[in-house]
Structure formats: structure tokens, C-alpha cells
Amino acid sequence: MNKEALKRLIAVAAGREEPDLVIKNAKVVDVFNARVIQGDIAIVDGLIAGVGDYSCKNELDAEGQYAAPGFIDSHIHIESSYVSPEELGRLLVPHGTTTIIADPHEIANVCGLKGLDYMIEAAKRTALDVQMMLPSCVPATPFEHSGANIDAREMEKPITYDEVLGLGEFMDFPGVINGVDATIEKLLVAKRAGKPIDGHSPGVSGNALNAYASARIGTDHECATVEEMHERIARGMYVLLRQGSACYNLRTLLKGVTPVNSRRCLFCADDCQPKTILSLGHLDNHLRICAEEGIDPIMAIQMATINAAECFGLKDRGAIAPGLKADIVLMDSLTNCRVEKVWIDGVLIADSGKYLPEIKRHDISSTKGNFKVKDFSVKKLKLAIQSPQAHVINILPGGVVTSKEVVAINRNSDNEFVYGHGQDVVKIAVVERHQNTGNVAVALLQGYGIKRGAIALSVAHDSHNIIVVGVDDTDMACAVEALIAQDGGIVLVNGEEVVESMPMPIAGLMSDQCGEWVEAKLTSIHSKAHEVLGVNADVEPVMTLCFMSLAVIPEIKLTDMGLFDVTKFDFISLEA
């Protein structure tokens, strides 16, 4: 801000000059005093000049509706929405979200730092304020091949970018707790830059949590219980209450939120797909859930706004107060939270559920060409097992956590696994797509329920190799080949024919289409997965499959290097 701009702001605030816009007759949510005040909001040059008695030529009568600060999602992966940053902005802003803190570690695992560059540039084309975090753990583990390896040395330049707010969720909590040199060097990169560090510490407690928090890792979104939440708050951390498309802890953790500790609580979605946004909303849905759970509505709005701003050092937003960004949400009530209008930097961006700006998309060519699959053939899907029993990946309710089970299997005369009709054990394979290694790891999956054909994805956390499940090797190979041909996404095959697909040309992770198109495609994919291929009715076919390669979530998962026991932190044999 220059001298003239500051003088004008002060003059408007004092009433000597006319604002650009006045929102009249609003019930203004005062997040500092946890109250509602009646007044007009004066806006000039994208900033709030004051709350009080103002007038100008350009006035909007709020008619007694509630004006709240713009909502801030404190942790989200844009890639998991399956749409581009520009499109996610179009979907989120009408629900009152004006800022998101995004961790692009999915695309970084595929494209490396050029993936971060793409996300930064694409995000500039949306009115939504996207604050990028620098991915901290690429790859997430050394037990798989990813498209990049970002070490501390490579982090030193991007951590200084104005567009990079801090260091993304630090999933390598064992490395922090045990003081591993390479891990400590990454933490120091952020500390030297004076930027915050986002956390990820599921199940960590006691002295281990002390060790993790001592590195001044400031947040955690992985709490499963109120006790874990309270322990983290006691260690000086902020706790993110999550309500997304895949994982939820909001209702559970709200039971532990009090007027005393609520200012250490923030909202996040983590992963949020178009269907969820279009049917339920975003942080406005968090607020409705808070109302259902009996949480004071002003306290809930603090968690959606000022708490996140203070946690991440965003001193220019989070409240309706003089000198702050004019990011304002007008809504009908503090319980129903139906968003009517949204301003970002004083400009009306959404009105009655409609995103107003024209969408201009960034070029995606830098994110394409990420399928380097060497010598793949149906023969690589054969699975010889020398014992009549095998370790299988058993899907538990929720579709993310698995258990290690031993089951009797069907084999042919060459000791190769054969799918038995009526037996809920099928082949699952991970095909390496980044480094031309030719790796194809095959294992067994239980609880998915597929009875015909195959499903292949290029979204497979966290390294995003190709993952495929099926009852027939030929169909599995057909699905993999079709997936490569369409530059990634989702493919369903039955009888060597593609019965449904969704191309995702942005790194094999995101569609270049609108959210409504993605929702319709996913609805069709889910329907055909259940009705044509026979996937169990209680299994979300895409989300469940994409987590079967995530080697940091117990108990066993499959990477391109083999069957991995997360508890033992080592590979195990299929034979039991």
C-alpha cells in the first residue's frame, strides 16, 4: 500500500471521503468479541474502511442479513477434487469460502516442482485466494517409485516464493521424532524462511508428540478422538476439524470444543469432491453441522475465519475490521448458513449460488505426458503363490484402513491364483508409471466385491502409480492400456470393452472439465461399478481403491515394489 492509498483508506474510515461500496443494515459478526453488531460496512480499494454509519452512491441493503468474514479452509488438496484450481474456485466461492490453504503434494508426486508451478499459475486465474504450501514429503515413503524426489536442497528456492505460505503437512512424523538428518533439514528450510509448518501426526502421543511439537509443527488434522485433540492443544498446536468427501472427524471432535479451547480449532475439508460440494456445500456445511451439534454459532464462525488466519499468519484477513481485506459473506442466518453473496477484495464474486467471474483456464501441457510404463503386458499380472494360503489386503469400513488377513485361495496346476466365483478375493496390481522401471506388483484384495471385469485408476495415493483391480487378467490389462491411452483418470472394463471412463489429463489426477461434468461422470462410474461389475454396495469404488497403495496408513497396502506391512514398516511375502 502506498501513501495515497493509506490516506484514502483513513479518510473513508473517518467519513471524510466516500467509500467504493457500503453494505447497509447488516448484522456484522464480530469475531473478536464473539458477538453480533448492527452496522454498515464501508469498503474502499478492496479493504474494509470501517463498520458503523456510512453511506455512498453505491450501496447494497443487507436487509438485516448476517455479514461474516470470508471462510478459510485451513487444509485442502485441490487434486483430490478431481478438478483444476480454477474450477474448484468456481465451486467453493458461492459457499462462502474466500481463502484455501492448499497442499499440492499429489501433483508434486507426479510432476515434481513443475507441478507446484502449474498449481500456482492456475490458481491465479480464480478469484478464490489460494495460499499454497510447499509439499514436504515427496515421495511419502521410500517404498515406492514416484515422479519426483524433493529434498531440502530443492525446497530452498520455492519456500521463498510469495505464493508459498509455508511447508505442507509433514507426514514423516517418525523422521521428526527420531531426528533423522534429511527430515530435520527440511524443517530448517521452512524455519529459515520464517514460514509455518503444517502437521500430520495420526496416533502420536506422549513424549513422541512432545518431540513432534517441539519442532514447532503447528497443526494436525488427523485427530481421531477428543483426547488426541486436547493433547495437541495442550502442546500448543492448532487442531483442524475435518469434514470432507473421504475422511471426517468434525462431529467427533466438536464434543471436545469448549469456549476456552475453541480458538485453537480450525476447519478443513482435506479432500472434497464436486458431488460433496454441489450437494452439501463446503465450510458452510461445517457451520450447519456445528449448529446441529449445539456449538455456539459465533464460536463456529471463529473456527471458520479468524482462527485459521491467526494460525497461519494471515494478518490481512479473518475478520470484518478496518484495514483488513474486504472478504465478506452475507448469509441468511447463523444456523442455516445459506450463503447469499460473497465479496473478495471488495468485489462481488458470487450471488445467490452463482460464481460471477468468467473462468479463464491455465494451459495444462506442462502436466501431461506422465505415463512412462515399460514393457507392460497381461503376463505381468500372473500371480504364482507357493502355499495354499496367502496374505490378503482386507478392506475395513471406511475404505482407507485395512487389515492383514490369511485366507485359503484357489490355484491352478501351475500354482497361479485363480479367481473363484463367490469368493471375495481378487487380484490387485500397481503398475509403475513414472520412471520406466517396468515394476508391476500383484497382490490379493478382500472386501471390494468386484465380480466381473476390472477397474483401473491413475489416482493412487501418494505416488499415483496405476492401480487396477479385477477378476480377469485380460480385462485388467485392457483397463491399464485404456487408462494410459486416455492420459490417466478412471477406466471400467468388462469383457475387454470399456464400459465407462473419465479422462484426467492434468497429471492423471484432475479433469479439465467442469465440476458438474465430473460429478455426472463419477455418478455413472459408481453406478456401473456396482451394477455391472458387482462391487460391494457399501464400498465407494474409486475412493477405496485409490487408498489401497497408501503405505503410511495401516495395516497392509500394495506399492509398485510389493506388499507392504505398515506396522512392521517392511515388505512381506504373499505366502502365509
UniProtKB/Swiss-Prot annotation:
The keyword Hydrolase applies. It is an enzyme of class 3 (hydrolase). Gene3D superfamilies: Metal-dependent hydrolases, Urease, subunit C, domain 1. Pfam families: Adenine_deam_C, Amidohydro_1. GO terms for molecular function: adenine deaminase activity. It catalyses: adenine + H2O + H(+) = hypoxanthine + NH4(+). Transmembrane segments: none annotated. Its EC number is 3.5.4.2. GO terms for biological process: adenine catabolic process. It comes from the Bacteria. The keyword Iron does not apply. Its cofactor is Mn(2+). HAMAP family: Adenine_deamin (MF_01518). This is Adenine deaminase 2. The lineage of its organism: Bacteria, Pseudomonadati, Thermodesulfobacteriota, Desulfobulbia, Desulfobulbales.
